[in-house]
Amino acid sequence: DKLETLHDGPNSLDSRAEIAAMKGDYEMALKYQLKAFDYATSSSPYQYNLPVYWRKGNQSDVSNGLIEAQKNMQNAILEGNVEDFSKYISNDFSLVTGDSNLGDFYNFSTENIAQDRNYNWNSFALRDFETHFSPDMRTAILTFYASGSYTFTDSSEEVAYSTRASSVWIATDQGWKCAHANWAP
């Protein structure tokens, strides 16, 4: 390649990565970006696109991982498992939630899990997921449906539950973290 003979350094490799990404060849983009990063691994400007190219090349796996994270986070909430729930939220930003009862949006935290409830879930299932990524692959929106039933503890009345839902996940240095969830009627 003429570019490589003129200049064989990190800028050249970074440019090759960008060109490969523009062509949709994220495997090649990742390969060149890793080579550029090898020149300067500490505070390297070449590090920024590494996760982008990896996520683009592994979009299906990333999507499946996010869907699994959503299910695991929901199970942790239902089971009152603060430790597991904490894996999916960030210390740097809140998880803002809107419930299907149409109340105000609020910050959902480990404190919410410990609250007493006047109902118990009989069943709760998530299904029909779709994953939508931002162009830089650093934000994902999951859309899905939830169904099940719960019983009020004071009256033993069973209520069927069905709603559509969405969540916003942000890629952080500690992994994907949920920033927003909406449970719409």
Annotated model-derived regions:
Residues 3-7, 40:
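Alpha-helical junction/boundary sensor with strong preference for TPR arrays
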Residues 15, 22, 48-49:
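"A position-specific structural signal for the A-helix of alpha-solenoid helical repeats
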Residues 26-44:
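TPR/TPR-like (Sel1-like) alpha-helical repeat modules
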Residues 51-91:
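Short, low-complexity N-terminal intrinsically disordered segments enriched in polar/charged residues
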Residues 82-138, 145, 159-160:
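A solvent-exposed, acidic/Ser-Thr-rich amphipathic alpha-helical stretch
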Residues 162-185:
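Short beta-strand edge/turn micro-motifs at domain boundaries
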